[in-house]
Amino acid sequence: MRRAEVARLIDHTLLAPAATDEEVLALCAEAARLGVGAVCVAPTHVYLAAASTYRSSHEAEPAFAVASVIGFPHGTHLTVIKAEEARRAVADGATEIDMVIDIANALDENWRAIETEISEVRLSVPPHVILKVILETALLPDANIIAACRAAEAGGAEFVKTSTGFHPAGGASVRAVRAMAEAVGGRLGIKASGGIRTAEKAKDMLEAGATRLGLSASADVLAGFPA
């Protein structure tokens, strides 16, 4: 794939707890320069990023989409809190929501609870908003990844996503992406996120079935693809 093609698959990400407004603005400026598909920020930075996307574009359309994380990073917020967090993020300008499931439900194989939680968040935002569901796949065997993906699909998600990037168990893996592709490939998007810092690893994820990449080192990764 060419650099520009890969760039459109990237969610350029800044989720550090101490990220400043200045750093978010720098992220957005870099996103516009690189031609990425979206930025991914904390709910408190959505308004700033959404305003920046139009300042970064010379056209009527925004330069990139704005994604907000929800229930991040542990997924243990009450569902009503996640739904309200999603509503407020959309009101501030987010067009994509990356929600963390209650990961214990995936370990306990409580698929109905996962589906219900996702459905409630899905219903809390307009249909045009893209909902991505973070599974924290490093904690799950393949069978649980597959079942969680199917619960996400039943709940109305548009994407499943590997990882928050914050859990010590690890981030995206080829194993997890392949399991996700087995479960919902061709029907839902698959976002690989967490620990992808080289073009080689990005290529591995795309070959395994990823259709979106969550990256903080976007410039370094893109430099490894042909112009």
From Swiss-Prot:
Pathway: Carbohydrate degradation; 2-deoxy-D-ribose 1-phosphate degradation; D-glyceraldehyde 3-phosphate and acetaldehyde from 2-deoxy-alpha-D-ribose 1-phosphate: step 2/2. SUPFAM superfamilies: Aldolase. Pfam families: DeoC. Keywords: Cytoplasm, Lyase, Schiff base. The keyword Lyase applies. Its EC number is 4.1.2.4. InterPro entries: Aldolase_TIM, DeoC, DeoC/FbaB/LacD_aldolase, DeoC_typeI. The keyword Cytoplasm applies. It catalyses: 2-deoxy-D-ribose 5-phosphate = D-glyceraldehyde 3-phosphate + acetaldehyde. It comes from the Bacteria. GO terms for biological process: 2-deoxyribose 1-phosphate catabolic process; carbohydrate catabolic process; deoxyribonucleotide catabolic process. It is an enzyme of class 4 (lyase). It is found in: Cytoplasm. Its main location: cytoplasm. GO terms for molecular function: deoxyribose-phosphate aldolase activity. The active site is at 98 (proton donor/acceptor), 161 (schiff-base intermediate with acetaldehyde), 191 (proton donor/acceptor). One of its GO terms (cellular component) is cytoplasm. Catalyzes a reversible aldol reaction between acetaldehyde and D-glyceraldehyde 3-phosphate to generate 2-deoxy-D-ribose 5-phosphate. Belongs to the DeoC/FbaB aldolase family. DeoC type 1 subfamily. This is Deoxyribose-phosphate aldolase. The gene is deoC.
